[in-house]
A protein has these predicted regions:
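Catalytic cores of nucleotide-sugar-dependent glycosyltransferases that transfer UDP/GDP/TDP-activated
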Residues: 1-487
């Protein structure tokens, strides 16, 4: 099968979140299964042209009512046959940032920028003489691709090409003023005809949902949640209408990077038969975070983006967050790695000055993230919603019992300990009291039933989260998309 991934980001070239990891990991797994996979994305300012191969002759790409000349460069995912093509347009992409910057969180001309990406993807296929079976668009920034395929170019060259749209996070939809519609390079009839109109403006993701042949999201539970009023961000009605083409497919993880048996970033490697070695990792974590070195005290790890979605208010809000109570009333240590909303960063630093058993690193550090996974006894994720989540999976792999809220991918990957079996601890409500109670329950099991706690750790470590399993599910979705256009 020939598969074209259209994306705003892909590791190792550009990354703002888990989407970039998923695109590359899925492409690699599909390639290993024998499929011809290519990725197309913008060449941002920080992607060095000197490390890429120039493709002679620019593309003429629709931009508003005219055309723009777009250069093309080529590379590949490391140690693979997956070609990565970069669309080069200095005005649109030659800037620092994928979607925006710290000072301008959302570039005002993103509709124009990502219309160049989507139109350019099809022009690239023409240039290469390579016509995919599947165009796989990722999130709102690539949502114009299914629209173009269905309403603009489904002629002889792309007559047998189907589209799949993956929603990584429904909270981000690409909503802009109607004034930007001409920059999309499509005729005005598609403002309504392709489902782009939303509250008098443009909603790129809504258009993609309306036009894609198949729609996937990153966990089965999240696929259900986005069809509800509570979890639908205004798209639930449309998603229910299109419910027969919506599938939830769990992300896999890169086991070459996240594997306690081989991880070079932790002080000692281990597996489910040598869990006692986690104590070495725990002592190193306590030392690095300047926590008292004590094997007997359970350590709770937190690695997170400090954003409302992640349940930070329930932990850190000055008037009602439970972190101070948790560290004062339960004999635990807490190791935090994260950055994000300034109020939360400041509150964490304030709490740290009052609590000797809570330490934080504001920012991101790859080696510390691995050490927290390996050295903690528990990993806390009180997310309000979580499309898939990866850290709870890393935690299970590393024998670190996740404490999570029952939502999205967290509900699909963690089994609540019921007294006899389970791989972690689940709570239902997004409240400080619910978080506190779940932590207390988990620590009680750890302290008073070592055999049960070891069984929880081993249950998580025996799970299979490889991308091979996820890739097969995506292939099934691709085949379903192709059947739909055969009708």
């Amino acid at each position: 099968m020939k598969i074209l991934m259209v994306t705003a980001e892909a590791v190792p070239f550009a990354k703002t979140g888990g989407l970039a990891d998923m695109v590359s990991a899925l492409a690699l797994s599909l390639s290993k299964l024998g499929h011809d996979v290519k990725i197309v994305m913008p060449r941002y300012y920080k992607i060095d042209r000197k490390k890429l191969q120039a493709i002679p002759g620019p593309l003429a790409v629709a931009a508003g009512t005219s055309e723009s000349w777009v250069g093309v460069y080529e590379s590949a995912l490391p140690s693979s046959n997956v070609a990565v093509y970069f669309l080069d347009h200095e005005g649109a992409f030659g800037r620092d940032g994928v979607y925006g910057t710290k000072s301008e969180t959302d570039f005002h001309d993103n509709p124009y920028r990502f219309s160049l990406l989507c139109h350019g993807a099809f022009q690239l296929c023409r240039k290469l003489g390579w016509y995919p079976d599947i165009v796989h668009a990722h999130d709102w920034s690539a949502s114009l691709a299914p629209i173009i395929l269905k309403h603009v170019i489904r002629n002889d060259l792309f007559a047998k090409t189907a589209s799949v749209l993956t929603i990584h996070n429904l909270g981000y939809q690409g909503q802009y003023a109607k004034d930007w519609f001409p920059s999309l390079g499509i005729h005005w009839g598609l403002y309504y005809g392709a489902g782009l109109e939303h509250n008098g403006g443009i909603n790129l993701l809504q258009g993609g949902i309306s036009c894609a042949d198949m729609i996937t999201t990153v966990s089965p539970t999240y696929a259900k949640e986005i069809q509800t009023t509570e979890g639908g961000f205004g798209m639930d009605g449309l998603l229910r209408v299109r419910g027969d083409v919506v599938r939830g497919i769990l992300n896999g993880i890169d086991e070459d990077v996240w594997n306690p048996k081989t991880d070079p970033l932790i002080p000692v490697n281990y597996d489910e038969t040598s869990l006692e070695k986690k104590a070495v990792c725990k002592r190193e974590l306590q030392k690095r975070m300047k926590l008292p070195e004590d094997d007997a005290v359970p350590v709770i790890g937190i690695v997170t983006r400090l954003a409302d979605q992640k349940g930070i208010a329930e932990l850190f809000a000055p008037t009602y967050g439970c972190m101070y109570r948790l560290c004062s009333e339960i004999d635990v240590q807490v190791a935090i790695l994260g950055s994000g909303e300034k109020w939360c960063e400041n509150e964490i630093l304030s709490l740290q000055s009052k609590l000797p058993n809570m330490r934080a690193y504001i920012g991101y550090d790859e080696s510390l993230s691995h050490l927290i996974e390996a050295g903690s006894d528990f990993f806390l994720m009180p997310s309000k919603y979580e499309p898939c989540g990866l850290n709870q999976i890393y935690s299970e792999m590393y024998g670190t019992a996740p404490i999570v809220r029952r939502t999205g991918g967290l509900a699909d990957t963690v089994e609540d300990f019921d007294g006899t079996s389970g791989s972690g601890f689940i709570f239902n409500e997004s409240t400080p009291d619910a978080v506190f109670s779940a932590v207390k329950r988990a620590v009680t099991v750890c302290r008073h039933d070592e055999k049960a706690f070891a069984a929880i750790q081993e249950a998580g470590m025996r799970k299979n989260f490889s991308w091979d399993k996820s890739a097969e599910a995506y292939l099934s979705a691709y085949r379903a998309a192709l059947k739909r256009i055969e009708r």
